[in-house]
Design a protein with these regions (language model features):
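A short, glycine/small-residue-rich beta-strand->loop->alpha-helix junction that serves as a flexible
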Residues: 7-19
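Extreme N-terminal starter segment of soluble prokaryotic enzymes
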Residues: 1-3
């Protein structure tokens, strides 16, 4: 099985929690190709120097002292939308010349395809905004839902138990459909089990 793994470049958390997934598939003798940009992709390249990597369009978005201002949030949403479109278009160009059996995107909104089974990793099924930005929260949740519903599955790196979990209402704040698979916390310091609560990390590969 040939797998493309693409984490968001927003801090190193998205890339670092992809490390145990990459190790799992390599142990299964699958072919893994990395994709991303910036420090996030650099971390994966340093961790897996033997793997090929594809550079994706960069998302230039960072927190500032004005990050809780409405103007910043509106601009950030616009940048995210543009980045998602650019990511998706670039990915489709890659897929036109190279085939994959599975795409795993850690919060990289545009890394999915109708022609390849795609998985989205997030612990924020229900985004929570600062108080002064609460007016935008319904829109933020609707936008995020629109994005992850384009994927075949959503992997939530947390426990399914509503009384025993790490991300609280971010991942347990409402109803969700069959796409959600709570796979347990991911850490680069821990080796994955052969199965993760019914998710795809097992010996039976996805079929396209």
């Amino acid at each position: 099985m040939k797998i493309l793994i693409a984490p968001l470049n927003w801090g190193l958390g998205h890339a670092s929690r992809c490390i145990p997934i990459i190790r799992h598939y390599l142990a299964q003798r699958d072919e893994v190709v990395l994709a991303g940009d910036g420090d996030s992709l650099l971390l994966l390249r340093k961790t897996f120097p033997e793997l090929r990597a594809i550079d994706l369009p960069s998302l230039e978005l960072c927190y500032t002292s004005n990050s809780q201002q409405k103007g910043f949030y509106i601009r950030a949403i616009w940048k995210l939308i543009r980045s998602t479109i650019a990511d998706h278009h670039y990915l489709e160009k890659v897929l036109a010349i190279e085939s994959f059996d599975l795409i795993i995107s850690d919060n990289r909104f545009g890394c999915c395809s109708r022609n390849v089974r795609s998985v989205y990793i997030t612990h924020q099924l229900y985004p929570i905004l600062p108080k002064r930005l609460q007016i935008f929260q319904p829109f933020a949740r609707a936008l995020h839902a629109f994005i992850y519903k384009r994927y075949a599955e959503v992997w939530v790196p947390d426990y399914a138990d509503t009384s025993h979990n790490l991300s609280g209402s971010l991942s347990h704040g409402g109803r969700f459909d069959h796409r959600a698979k709570y796979i347990g916390p991911l850490s680069r310091f821990v080796t994955l089990h052969s199965t993760l609560h019914g998710a795809t990390l097992h010996n039976t590969p996805y079929t396209t």
